[in-house]
Amino acid sequence: MLTSPTLQEYLGYCLIPSTKGQKMMLIVGKGGEGKSRIGLVLKRLMGDAANNGSVQKVENNRFARADLEGRLLMIDDDMDMNALPKTNYIKTIVTAEAKLDLERKGVQSYQRDIYARFLCFGNGALTSLYDHSDGFFRRQLILTTKDKPADRTDDPFLVEKMCAELEGILLWCLEGLHRLVQNNFRFTVSERAAANVDTIKRSSNNVIDFMESEGYFRFKAEIGRAHV
């Protein structure tokens, strides 16, 4: 998984206080692949600049957004598969072009710049009940993992071994950041990653396939005068 240029660029992107990339990342698998190990290593690498949270809570709980203050990364290591009832805050935080209203219990609301990026791990994609817009899906980078081999024996010390190589991992991330900046914050997106977004977009909105199917609409059909 660590050979992905998209992942390399995104992890590098999470090291700086900028949202110019205007993307969040989802890493999706069937379970047991070890994808959440990435989050544990990043937490060790970034310290207090990263925290664990929930995309669902950020969108639906008015106090959860304050936990993003001063963070560069929020890791959702077991993403809730329920469709979001709304997406306003998620989209706003991913682009972060203005200060965000934050609330804490017993404290008057205040505004802050939020630079937290989202890295989510789950067994499915992030979907919305009502928002099927291009703006919602355009903000997502979706990577899929290879299935876990049936004969693979898990290494219980994998995280510790990776953390022993934190210096090399940091340099790898910085290489991705450099490439991203050189490309004006446009991520390298493989055909497979682009297809992942398209698949999720179509599965959440059957109208797309309906409109593109043959036999329902003939946009270029000519109507003769005799039929008018």
Question: How would you name each of these model-derived features?
Answer:
Residues 1-225:
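Feature primarily recognizes SF3-like P-loop helicase cores of small DNA viruses
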